[in-house]
Amino acid sequence: MNTAFRVRTSATLFLMKELLLPLVIWLPLFAQSPAPFTLYQTIQIDGANYQAIITKPETSGKHPAVFLIGGLGCYSLDNLKPEDPFFQLLSGLTQRGYVTMRVDKNGEGKSEGPPCDSPQSDLQLAVKRSLAGLNALAASNYVDRDNIFILAHSIGPLEGVLVAQKFPVRGFIAAETIGRSWFEYELENVRRQLFILGHPYDEADRTVRIIERCQHRFFVEKQTPEQILKTSPECKDAVNTFGVSYTYLQEIADLDLAVEWKKVDVPVLVTYGTSDPATWSEENRYLADMINSFHPGRASYLEFPSMGHGLDLVPSKRAWLENIRKHEHGPFDQEFLKQVADWLDKNLAAKH
């Protein structure tokens, strides 16, 4: 296990002194210098400069591309260390012939714009950021603009499905995510993780009832965390925004995912790792089934034994939660890279 691995404390939800984790990405492991064949590009959004980080194959000509949308939180994806799963994923895809791009969030790394945790940093800005990156990627002379894919992780597909409605992607990979509403997911996630950690049913029910009352005010009534906590201090954990703006999470909770996915008619690969405690197989199968109900045959589902939420190998969901507490993670699941790259290659070979 890598003891250098760190987790943002703002990206965890503590209830009953136990760790309850939503769809997040961990704080990445940073290297002192960028990986070979890494390029940087500045893109503009609302007059502010944002940094795009690109990896590119050594060979000349136009290449297919993968645009990464990460999970919940405020962090930079620049200068990832070689042991970071996302470094290995993006490097592996580049070795398979794909250009990759990720754009640092506003206020993170060298990206300008409003602070990542400010009310101005909402879902609409996140969508703008990805669209600006995709348009810059498509304009690059080393990218085949007709073969650009989105790879979105965790909460990323909830942003990505909006992006894919406005940019013609070749396909979409939705990794470790959800298919139902955020509010439903939050309640079920609390219950499920309490069971994973060994809590009794009555305690789980009591906790979920508190969470539901608090989050109804937050997600449905659109009260701010400060307004809620003035009268209900017991809601502190329930309205934790995991370091991002409350406006972003309220807009995420407003999404009707079935309505949004119905608008996207491209091949979709939905993946789930069996050691992931931040979502579950039924949720990801639900997403694949939903997409296929609207666009028959478009969605595929792949399950990865012993893979955790961070695309790392661990023996169980509980072990993954315990590793996070100790600021550790397992090795990257190379099978995930292989299957994703094979799926990309297959869709490249297929006729449009």
PLM segments and residue spans:
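N-terminal cap/lid segment of alpha/beta-hydrolase-fold proteins
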Residues: 33-61
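Short beta-strand element of the alpha/beta-hydrolase
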Residues: 62-71
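Conserved alpha/beta-hydrolase
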Residues: 88-112
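Alpha/beta-hydrolase active-site loop
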Residues: 119-140
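Primarily recognizes the serine-hydrolase "nucleophile elbow" in alpha/beta-hydrolase
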Residues: 136-196
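Accessory cap/linker subdomain of secreted extracellular hydrolases
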Residues: 173-263
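Short beta-strand/loop motif that positions the catalytic acidic residue
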Residues: 264, 270-272
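Conserved alpha/beta-hydrolase "acid-adjacent" motif
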Residues: 277-285
